[in-house]
């Protein structure tokens, strides 16, 4: 959202959900001029508890939007753009189910148009019309490497042998996957690879919970990323000190979701580790399903690359399992000597 606002030089056409619903939602009397709203990452809508905490309205964002639509004079269209498996924050765990729950308490009949696979999720709608044209299943992010999302899904499911098979397919399509324990090797590689390419974008990504990466140059602590200038980070030219290409500032899953880089350097943190047969995490995070939220965070991070990605794994014995798992999944080892 901030990247679009920065690029368009406008805060009117693209707004954040929280601000929009503070103005027009709940029991407010103000009415928007628009009858069509596009909700990017609609599966990440806040539930009633989170909405109460954020803006004092004990009503979920889906219900708030639909009730607002019913208050309009004649008609309303809610377009939801959905990225499955990308619920990454507290209050988002219910996913698309919240939209069906909201439909179930509406006063007016709502018609849902969706891909066939999602049709069973909207049993509370007055009518469900499925159309496969709404299933946007061809990625524009990975330059025709269409198996990238499948590789990431298999990795997070712990199916390393299937990842190995898919990695050969991806590399054949020109998508590069590297793993390194030398952060300087990663920095050297992206700078050399994209030397002179003024439209190229590469940068540092890390999980918001990976505090151990601070000592390796990943500035992913909360206060830093909260004040980060996300628009310039993605859009400024490489020579700008605010650009991602400066390799100074780090974007987390919250800043980079829905956007992409040519070659991200992804720091793997202590918030998700390999057990030998799958992935695990701490249960101290204040969410309903901490493991799924962490898996989804890494799903976002690992699917940002257009040309590929580099995963940096700290050179500490604790992370040996992660490094070997990524190698077994088909990631090529990158060292400073190799660069």
Residue ranges and their predicted role:
Residues 14, 78, 133-135:
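Conserved beta-strand scaffold positions in the cores of enzyme catalytic domains, especially
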Residues 1-6:
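Conserved Walker A/P-loop ATP-binding site and its immediately adjacent core
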Residues 7-71, 248-252:
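Conserved RecA-like ASCE ATPase "motif II neighborhood" in helicase/translocase motors
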Residues 43-125:
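Signature of the SF2 helicase/ATPase Hel1-core->accessory helical subdomain module
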Residues 77, 249-339:
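C-terminal accessory regions
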């Amino acid at each position: 959202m901030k990247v679009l606002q920065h690029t368009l030089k406008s805060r009117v056409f693209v707004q954040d959900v929280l601000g929009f619903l503070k103005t027009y939602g709940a029991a407010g009397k103000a009415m928007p001029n628009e009858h069509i709203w596009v909700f990017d990452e609609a599966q990440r809508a806040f539930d009633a508890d989170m909405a109460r905490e954020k803006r004092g309205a004990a009503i979920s964002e889906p219900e708030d939007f639909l009730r607002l639509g019913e208050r309009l004079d004649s008609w309303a269209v809610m377009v939801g753009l959905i990225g499955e498996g990308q619920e990454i924050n507290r209050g988002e765990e219910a996913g698309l189910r919240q939209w069906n729950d909201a439909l179930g308490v509406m006063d007016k009949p709502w018609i849902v148009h969706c891909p066939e696979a999602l049709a069973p999720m909207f049993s509370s709608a007055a009518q469900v019309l499925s159309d496969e044209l709404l299933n946007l299943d061809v990625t524009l992010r990975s330059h025709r490497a269409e198996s990238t999302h499948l590789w990431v899904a298999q990795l997070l499911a712990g199916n390393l042998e299937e990842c190995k098979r898919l990695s050969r397919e991806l590399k054949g399509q020109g998508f590069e996957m590297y793993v390194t324990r030398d952060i300087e090797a990663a920095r050297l590689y992206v700078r050399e690879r994209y030397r002179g390419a003024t439209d190229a974008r590469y940068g540092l990504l890390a999980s918001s919970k990976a505090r151990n990466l601070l000592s390796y140059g990943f500035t992913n602590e909360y206060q830093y990323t909260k004040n980060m200038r996300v628009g310039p980070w993605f859009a400024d030219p490489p020579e700008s000190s605010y650009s991602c290409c400066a390799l100074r500032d780090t974007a987390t899953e919250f800043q980079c979701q829905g956007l992409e880089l040519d070659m991200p350097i992804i720091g793997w943190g202590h918030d998700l580790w390999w057990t030998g047969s799958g992935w695990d995490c701490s249960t101290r995070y204040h969410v309903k399903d901490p493991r799924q939220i962490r898996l989804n965070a890494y799903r976002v991070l690992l699917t940002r690359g257009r040309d590929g990605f580099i995963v940096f794994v700290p050179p500490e014995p604790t992370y040996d399992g992660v490094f070997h798992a990524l190698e077994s999944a088909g990631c090529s080892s990158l060292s400073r000597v190799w660069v």
